Amino acid sequence: MLARPPTASILLRSPFSCLPARRLSLSSAPPSAFFSCRLSTAATRPPPTAQRALLYVPGSNPKQLKKCLGGGLAQSQPDALILDLEDSVRAEKKGEARRNVLDALQATPDCPSQKFVRINSKQLGLDDLEVLLTTPHLEGLVLPKVHSAADVQLVDRFIEEHGLRETKDKLRIVASIESPLALLNLREIATSSTRISSLLFAAEDFCASSGLIRTPSRREMLFARSSVVTAAKAFGLKAVDLVCVQYKGDEALGVLEDEAREGRELGFDGKQAIHPAQVNVIQAAFTPSPAAIERALAILSQYEAARSSGAGAYGLENADGSSSMIDAPMLLQAEGTLAQARAAGVDV
């Protein structure tokens, strides 16, 4: 078990701190000190970028690939695209889809979205990689049916042996959590490779393999979703929430908005999308609101005043005239809010 270094706060222990084993007071440490480090397993990972909406695009549809990769979604362009070679592609179309995806990646190097490909599992996935690793325009992979560290390490070794020298160290891996076994092995999956950047919760597969009955409340998946978030945050990874299978009409978008808000409250960084109509709703839900940004800025501003007086905690006046005590954990939350806003392109 990894030991957690002591916190830099005089008030509470912080699970985010990687500072040396000494005590500091809020009056001697800048706010950024509390967010400056991650666990050593994340030391060589690429810098974080927003992954609010991750939109699946069938690899068997060249027209959709061209539109999505070419920036043709206009105001609905997601943070990330997942070009799919797995569930959305019939068995007899796998080879054709593989070629479609490679051609699309080669033709659109300036795509405004991050470019991931969901490969198949087992040998078929290695066949996918043989083709995909020939292009420098692939940014990451979504690995389906990850049950243990071995599933990630197989792909990791293949990338190391066959990837292009100039790009293989930049490739990110998103591990799809789809089974009870994967849930039990979250720790080893999260630390299986320095290429791991995110854990993704695949709700339909998880319910099918667990015998869970899907309900509108989603309460049957609360433990699994929370476990994925906890593991991701423990090791400096992003957590991606489930797909909302409804996308047509106002009622469907209302369900999506509720799901996305709930996912954000649970700690997820983003959510999978299966239709461009879902993108804006998702990205709005995972972007800090103007009020949240304003409050975060006020907390950091008040921090400077408290630091000069040597106070470890201080009060902040709320919009309704009441006051809230602000201490180290809330300072961390404020830093996190501003980091999320900047990653989403908000000028803070």
Protein language model features and the residues they cover:
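Expand to "…catalyze enediolate/carbanion chemistry for C-C bond making/breaking, isomerization
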Residues: 2-348
